[in-house]
Amino acid sequence: VLEPDLKLGRGGLRDANVLGWLELLDPELLERDRAVYDAAVRVLLDARVALHRRFTRPSDVLLLQEQDGVAADLGYPDADDLMAAVAGAARAVEWLTDDAFDRLDRGGRRWRRNRTRRLGNGVVLRGGQIQLDEPVAAEDTAAAVQLLDIALAAAHSGLRIGRATLETFAAAGRTFPEPWPSEIKDRFVELLRSGRPMIPVVETLDHWGLMVRIIPEWAPCRSRPQRNAYHRFTVDRHLCEAAANAAGLVARVDRPDLLVAGALLHDIGKGYPPRDHTEVGVEIVEDLAPRLGFDAADTVVLVDMVRHHLLLPDVATRRDLSDRGTIDGVARQVGSVPTLRLLQALTEADSMATGPAAWGEWKAALVRELADKTAHVLAGGSIEDAVSSQFPTVDHRRLMAESRRSVHGEGFTLTVVDHDRPGLFSKVAGVVALNGLDVLAAAAFSDEDGMALCEFRVEPSNPDADAIDWVRVADDVERALDGRLAVRARLAERARTYVRRRPLQARPWAPFDNKVIFDNETSANATVVEVRAHDAIGLLHRITSTMAELDLDIRSAKVQTLGDHVVDAFYVRDQSGGKIDDEEYLAEISRALGAVLRA
């Protein structure tokens, strides 16, 4: 959890108190877990006391902006180490609490105690638990098969693994052979394919130190925080969530085994900062996949899944999907339709595991469009057919041929036609922001007769807002284009009001750097200007106003909000209608946009 409640959160101090109260009923309840329990409670108490010392009022929620200070007060190297310790402590308390209630519950169900159902390979269902009914095998392969059979039985039944069985395996110290034979690999893949029931099983194995015996590279990912407003899980839990989501998508791909394995491993490089997690992940999986029993060809695919796991979502949300350079570039990187479909499913599984802001109908449609166009090219189809643009449409051209202004809003789309002039795009963008709307994507077009077209795909900033009042929006656009609406001044007023009414939403301390990036490779006839910045009211208006001042022609735009920041991409041309390759001009654009982002 990004901002854990140290007292009332799952695995927090209240749960620890409950364990203490249960111990009054059963003095032997924590006898074997005393060291783990005491260490976990100490971490949580220390963090809570340090947090209270920093607040003038009681607070048990360890907010993101307080984590660096609390970490320093407690002597942690940084906030990541603090949050990893807190997450690990909470998991320990959570597991101990669940185990305690399970033992007490089973103690009151005498009818279950002596019922035994044999599941094979020494695995039994007894007393409502999955247990091993024979010694751990002396040979590593046989012991690994036993452990995975137990894990599979727990996932399939939804029952807990018996504590004695876990203690036995933990004490046995068996390691997994290298490379894995098929009987181990197949069982592990089956465990991943069991979906959500797999998650508590993996977390149980991890609690007992068994997950790192299965995959040693898992260790640095354990309880590792992802300290941004976009992710809701630690790295290890995120990987499990992604694999569980992928299990529900296996019907879409030719190789379900590669999909779930790739989902489990796609972010494993995040356990090894400060290097780029994708680069590290590629190196890890190049070595790890063969050890897990995947042959050379499958290893190449798994490595490609790690290398390109952000390719589809990044391109779909930041690049023009009607530009042949976009589709050609993705096709060249992916290489085949089967790999493309694996990446498409991985994108969905990964995004859903990230958080509610990371996946929705709009993003899903963009990824699907990109994947389908790329698949068409990879299957031998014409790239011209794949990127045949539907913008401007026949209706758009008919409106432009009338040589008069037209402002129309319907559904989630605002379409504006007017005589071409500098700043038209930015004025409309400003009106959109004034009306409490977020821009998801935008496109612009100018014809030889001096008419301009702008189309904005929008959604309300407030998800609970009523339907868009298009009459009001259209009236504001008309006034702005006539010079009768002070767009910039009104946006400044709205920004001040927004900050006063929603102070907790402004998070300037979030770890994110403003950047302006130029891409002259993706498109054959436009320069892509990518702007990464903290979100703010009217930001799109200020950026595009600055571009207009520099005589940049905006052909299309992709706008994406990621938690508290945005990644906007603009396809722009110079006055002659070409790409911008003059270094001095690019530097001036960067200087101007940098000033906007710092304001």
Model-predicted segments: where are they?
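Secondary-structure transition/capping motifs at alpha-helix termini
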Residues: 26, 213, 248-257, 271-276, ...
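Conserved catalytic alpha/beta cores of large enzymes that bind or transform nucleotide phosphates
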Residues: 175-185, 189, 246, 289, ...
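Active-site-adjacent "gating/activation" loops or surface patches in catalytic cores
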Residues: 117-135, 157, 207-273, 510-514, ...
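Non-catalytic interface/linker regions that flank or bridge core catalytic/transmembrane domains
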Residues: 1-229
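Secondary-structure capping and boundary motifs in well-ordered enzyme cores
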Residues: 8-15, 35-43, 85, 197, ...
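His-Asp-centered metal-binding catalytic motifs of divalent-metal-dependent phosphohydrolases/nucleases
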Residues: 16, 47, 205, 242, ...
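Short low-complexity, flexible loop/linker segments enriched in glycine and/or proline
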Residues: 44, 178-180, 228-229, 288, ...
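Non-catalytic interaction/regulatory segments
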Residues: 55, 62, 69-72, 76, ...
